[in-house]
Curated annotation (Swiss-Prot):
Organism: Bacillus pumilus (strain SAFR-032)
Name of the protein this chain belongs to: Ribonuclease P protein component
UniProt keyword annotation of RNA-binding present: yes
Matches recorded under InterPro entries: Ribosomal_Su5_D2-typ_SF (IPR020568), Ribsml_uS5_D2-typ_fold_subgr (IPR014721), RNase_P (IPR000100), RNase_P_CS (IPR020539)
Gene assigned in the entry: rnpA
Taxon lineage: Bacteria, Bacillati, Bacillota, Bacilli, Bacillales
Assembly and oligomerization: Consists of a catalytic RNA component (M1 or rnpB) and a protein subunit.
UniProt keyword terms in alphabetical order: Endonuclease, Hydrolase, Nuclease, RNA-binding, tRNA processing
Catalytic activity: Endonucleolytic cleavage of RNA, removing 5'-extranucleotides from tRNA precursor
Length: 119
């Protein structure tokens, strides 16, 4: 994931938290905010120290980034996303992480509409 596709600054995070919409399941919370003047999606990650040591937190962040790499082309691009990992996320494999995030993507309707094929 390129640096320009990441949320880094506290102000950027606060803007998404205050003005964005959230959706959650047991493992993750996703905040999303429309950014109409932006071409590509941006991703911010938050993994609390309560979840585990640095190795565990970095592993979770790598898994989330990989899911966004694989699914990113299907998501609405003109948005900022923040993913907050909850404690149960530390026990997930990559496939389970992907499934959990896909569930949230469907629930929050962030997949791009596919053009219907006409017969």
């Amino acid at each position: 994931m390129k640096k320009r596709n990441r949320l880094k600054k506290n102000e950027e995070f606060q803007k998404v938290f205050k003005k964005g919409q959230s959706m959650a399941n047991r493992q993750f919370v996703i905040y999303q905010l429309d950014q109409p003047n932006q071409d590509e999606l941006r991703l911010g990650l938050s993994v609390s120290k309560k979840i585990g040591n640095a190795v565990m937190r970095n592993r979770i962040k790598r898994l989330i980034r990989q899911v966004f790499l694989e699914e990113g082309h299907k998501l609405k691009q003109e948005k900022d996303y923040i993913v907050i990992a909850r404690k149960p996320a530390s026990e997930l494999t990559f496939e389970e992480t992907k499934k959990s995030l896909q569930h949230l993507f469907r629930k929050s309707a962030v997949y791009q509409q596919q053009p219907k094929k006409s017969s």
